[in-house]
Structures are given as structure tokens and as C-alpha cells.
Amino acid sequence: MTNRFEPTDLVVPFEQLRMSDVEVVGGKNASLGEMISQLPNGVRVPTGFATTAHAFREFLKHGGLTERISQRLATLDTEDVRALAVAGAEIRGWIEAQPFPADLEAAIRGAFAKLAGDNLQASFAVRSSATAEDLPDASFAGQQETFLNVVGIEDVLHKMKEVFASLYNDRAISYRVHKGFAHDVVALSAGVQRMVRSDLGAAGVMFTIDTESGFSDVVFVTSSYGLGETVVQGAVNPDEFYVHKPALKAGKQAVIRRNLGSKLIKMEFATPEEKAASGKLVRTVDTTVEARNRYSLTNEDVTELARYAVIIEEHYGRPMDIEWGKDGTDGHLYILQARPETVKSQQQGKAEQRYKLKGTGTVLAEGRAIGQKIGTGPVRIVHNISEMDTVKPGDILVTDMTDPNWEPVMKRASAIVTNRGGRTCHAAIIARELGIPAVVGCGNATERLSNGTLVTVACSEGDTGYIYEGLLETEVTEVTRGEMPHIGLKIMMNVGNPQLAFDFCQMPNSGVGLARLEFIINNNIGVHPKAILDYPNIDSDLKKAVESVARGHASPRAFYVDKLAEGIATIAAAFWPKPVIVRLSDFKSNEYKKLIGGSRYEPEEENPMLGFRGASRYISAEFGEAFAMECEALKRVRNDMGLSNIEIMVPFVRTLKQAERVTGMLADHGLVRESQGGKDGLRIIMMCEVPSNAILAEQFLAYFDGMSIGSNDLTQLTLGLDRDSGLELLAHDFDERDPAVKAMISRAIAACRAQGKYIGICGQGPSDHPDFAEWLADEGIVSISLNPDTVVDTWQRLAARG
């Protein structure tokens, strides 16, 4: 504390507060003061004032409560949920019945009069700020109360007393014991802040790192209509946005990924009549269908919020958890709170456990995955707080949503499952802190699951978390994230699922040797590209399906390009600035047929593996427009988002004529190799997977900047084996290490090296056979692209050879 105010001051304006005042006004209020006084003018933070810890202690001392509370808590067993509830209610009753000391009440009235001015109907938020809250090693996660839409000094005084009492909520008492804080060293400051009219706009939470992987190069923003409490509490499934910090800094289009939330309800101010009748300050109402089907923020809003987030993170020098609101009257964005992120940022640099299911089962429910672990146990459905004591250690806690009152029992669960909520909701925050998996926003988990059923809760498969029937076997491995020894070639990764890219990129790697579009098309789009292009001239059922998936986008075609671009950009941003080689779509006709509408457009083929795929498809009149959408997505990611680390790979190029035509089409769509006058270092590579590619390697290289060996297809076509056959009689003959296959690979490597062009491999072979990887290194291959789970072992084995 400095001479900005006196140690005995009871009330302090936010403008006079700094982060050094945490012991005086708690982390929340100190942070507000710091931002108002120290951040650039462009970052808007609503002003207000705070009562001090000294004021709180004087308040308790005034009524002799200090000693009474201490004695009441001295013998309390916080594991006894009912005893905890009785003690908490008793203490809160004492505090709310206690009058303010005259000097404290006068100070509050004076500060409020100055803040409100002539606007007698102005709305304020009355928030708690515990003096141990928001320290980097502990998240108090909203344990004390917040009151919104408080109007007039009498209501402010009343709510302040409730805020003081909330220091002794059941969850707060339990949490202090769990974290080792003595009750009497934690005091409470009440902050009174001018309200942003986000009830007429939108609000949410953002983190300056990815909440699941800890990846630090993105800002993660959640948003929903109305007051932000619905997002914080987990009452809605919000919209989600990822912003790439390097692109933001470079002035490029930085929003790399969006997920449309259901946003079923919103919280708004109660009317004066409702307040008079029920005393409620806010109410929840259903969101209109039209509003649900569009994003609650524009890309421009998201970009501005991300700029604020980066400024705040740089000021504090650590990852931050930030609440924001968009005022529906003036259209401006405001920062409402900022606190240190308390989970992932403290795990940086540590060896991590990676969980993997060894089996599969019936999916009973699914939602947003929180964390990357797997939990098993019996289902325990809890409908309300009165049933909390039914949760036993190791249970799977299943409920509609959680709030801070649930925390005493959440730590008993082996996993948490909720109907509602997004990645920044209360259940998600506490699950991360406790280190247990959670699946939130399932919609109907309390209906789909039954008490006592043994289930597996898996958060190890990307953004989506699954609840499987039965206890599935799980494999747990330690993942190294440190420096690896130097070897004479590059170890890259095969990545199909963009949702795992932020995690994979933190493992040792030299980039991505194969980024597949098939996962993005299958999981993020799900519709055949020709059904998208033929819309609206398609049958009614297909039309409804297309309209359903394309919600929130300008058109079905825009949806297809947007989702492709977002998936590609997520992988490219994760590994930036290392190279990411994106293979154009390589579905076979039987795989395209499985997409919505696919059966209407795909031919019947006896052996799709040898049929209408790869370059043959792109250059055909039937698929030309669909190919154009892929090119548009790639161009957007490279040019507009500035992710020029993307390189393009063309699969299954059978003939030199196809090579000429497909590279010409790419150029026509604005994707020109740098060696042919293109910009930003674009390289176009071909898959070497047809024997003709190796036999005529020198001629094919006239059209491409290198080759990547697809050992799966090259093996089947060299040996005449159908890898989709399924016949055990043939399985033992399928081996990339066969001398004929090796001869093809050697020829391709030699041709590329002779011309100084890239040569890598991205097939399954090196992942399955370590000796094959060693042979490739001896042959002079430039890079080996592996499945992520084999990267470290292969790297270390190659390094050990010297």
C-alpha cells in the first residue's frame, strides 16, 4: 500500500487501487483498479469503489462476531455436508442481522453518491472480492456472491451485507479447508461497479490460453446473449471462438475457429414490477430461435476482445481468465473482471499423462470434453443440492448444472457430467482444478443415464467428450515435452483431428507431414459437397439437413468453406511457424457416400480404393466446383489469416497429364507455387503412392516441389494387395518392408535428392515398424511423419544409433 489511501480507510475508489492492494481489497477489486489506472485508454473497464478488509474486520468486531465465528468453525467437520450446511447458515444469519458501524455506512453512502451522480436509476453490480481470491495458485471460482442490477443506496447496503455473509457459504468454508487457508486470515471486500448493459447485448468469459491443452498462442472466447452469469454458471452452451495471437499481432484475420452454441436462454434485468413483487433483480428468458441460430458476436467484436485480452496478459505477465460484456445501448465492449488462470498455466513444462481408450462401447451421451483424462465409476444423478450427500467417492456425478454450492461433493467424483454449460462454466473450472474429467453441455445426460450404471467418461478424443456404457480399459502413458536430441532428419506428425492439434504441437516435432481434410469434412461438415452446391435445388429432407448444419453462416457454401478453413487454420496455428503439409481431400466414393446426401452423388464401384479418388476427382467436371471450395479455404487460411506455413499436397496422381492439369487448376484458383511466381513460399507436394510416381519420379517433379511417400497405397499397388480386403490370408503379405516396395521408395528418394526437392514419408509404416524408420533414415529421407503416440519413441531410437 502507498499514500494513495490510508491503512484505516474503509472505502477506496477503484482508480486508487493497484494489484499491490490484494490484501486490502482482494484480487478482484485490486485487479479492476489496476486495469482502470494502468491499461491503455482503449481498454474499457467500468468504474466503482470497494470496501476494505479493514472495514470487513471492523464490521465483524463491531458486533462481537469475530470470536463467535471462530468458535463455531473450530470443531466443524467439513466432510459432514449436513453439519456444514447448519453451521454456514447460522453464521450467515448473524452477519446479515448485524448493523453497519456508523462510520462505515457513512463512507459507503458517500462513495455511492459520487459514483451514481444524478442518475438515481443507474444499475450496479455488487461483487465479492476475497483477500485470498484469484491468487495464481488457487481459484475461488465465484464462491462468494455477486448481485446484478442493484439500484439505489438502500439496496446496495443490503446486498453488501449479503456479500459479507457469503464468505461463510458452505462451499467457501469447505474450499478454504481443502486449500489450507485459515478462516480468520481471509477477509472480504465488497466492490460496487457500474453495470454494463449486456442484458441488451452479450457477455462471456475469455482465457489467454487454450483451457484444455494450455496452448499459449490463442485467446479462447465464449459468448452468449444477456448477462454473463449464464456463461459463468454453465446455464447455457455458449458460442466459442479461438483467436490466433501471432495473426492478431500481424494484423491478419485472426479468428481461426468458431463453434455455434445453442444459447437457449439469456439473463436480463427484472422489471421494476418483478423486483417489487419477488425481490428478484434478474430473470432468465428463452432466446429466440433466430438468435440461437446466429453467433452472438461478430468476428470484429471477437478480434477486439482478443486485443484487450493480449494487452491484459502482457500487463500481468501471465495467462489470464477475463470476464467481459458488450453493452447493448452503446455497442462497446467492456472488461468486467480479470484474474490469473489457475490450472493449465501451472502445469507448463511438466511431463503429462496421456489417456487412451483400449476398447469401445455404446455411447450413452456426449458433450464438450473438459480436460483430457478418462474416469470410470457408477452413475450418481443429483437433481438438486439436497441430494448432494448421496455422492460417494468414485461416483460419476451427473446433474443439470453445478454452481459453487456443489463444490464440497465435486471433489469426491471420478468424473462430472452436466446437461448444460460450456468450457468456461463453473463445472469445467472446478473439474480442471481437481484434475478430473468432465463432459458438459450434454443436453439430456440426466435422462440418458441411470443411477448405478457403470460408465466410462472419456475426454481423450478431442473437443467432444463421450460417456460409454461399461468400464472400458484405459492406457495411460507419460508424454515428454522437453528438448529432444538432434538427429539427421525431421520428425513430423500426422494430424487429422484439429481439436487435438493444440495438444500435439507441444510434443517434440518439426511440423506436420500430413494434415488430413477427411476428419474435418466428416466431423465438422458432415454433408457431401455437391449437396451443398446444389442447395436449394435438392429434396426437402436433404434441404433441412443442409440448413441445420449451416446455421450461423451466410450460406451453405460459405459454411463448407468456413468449416474447412477453420479446421485447416487450427492445425496451422497450432504448429506455426513450422510447416504444415495439408493433403487435399482423399475420400474414396464409398467414404463420400457416407456423408449426408452422399448416396445421391457417388458412383457404385467394385473397388473404390482404385477408383474415383485423388487427382482424378479434382480434374473431373463432376467435382470441379467442390474442388474449388477446398482451394478457397486454403487460400483464405494462407492469405487472409497469414498462415503461410501451409503447404499443399495432392494425393493419388496417376499420370503426368493429371499432374499438369491439377497444378494448373490450383494455379487458376490462386494457389501458385513460389517457384512459378507464387507468393509467401507456397510449395505444392505430391503423394508418391502409385508405382508410376516412383518410376517416373523425375518427370513428376517438374510439376511439384517434392514428394511424400504414402507407404500404405504404394505397398498395396506394388504388391497387388487390396488393403481393404480384410482377408487374413493376404494380411501377412502386406508389408512396407518388402524389397519391391523398398525399391520404389529408394527410387523416389534418390530422384528428389538429385533435384534438391523435399522428400518425406507420411504412411503408417514408420509408426508400426521402427526398423523401417531406421532404413528410411539411412536412405536419406528428409522427414518422417508419424502418428503422435510414436513420435518420442521413434525419435529416441534414431538418436540412439548415433
Where are these regions (language model features)?
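N-terminal beta-alpha lobe that positions the nucleotide/phosphoryl donor
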Residues: 1-191, 200, 289-300, 305-308, ...
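Acidic, glycine-rich flexible loop/linker segments
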Residues: 66, 329, 340-345, 364-369, ...
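Long, charged amphipathic helices and adjacent flexible linkers at domain junctions
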Residues: 73-76, 84-87, 108, 180-181, ...
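Conserved alpha/beta-domain cores
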Residues: 112, 119-125, 130-140, 144-148, ...
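Extended active-site and interfacial segments that coordinate phosphate-rich ligands
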Residues: 140-174, 198-274, 336-368, 412-419, ...
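Conserved metal-phosphate-binding beta-hairpin within the catalytic cores
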Residues: 142, 317-342
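Conserved catalytic alpha/beta cores of large enzymes that bind or transform nucleotide phosphates
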Residues: 218-321, 326-329, 368-375, 399, ...
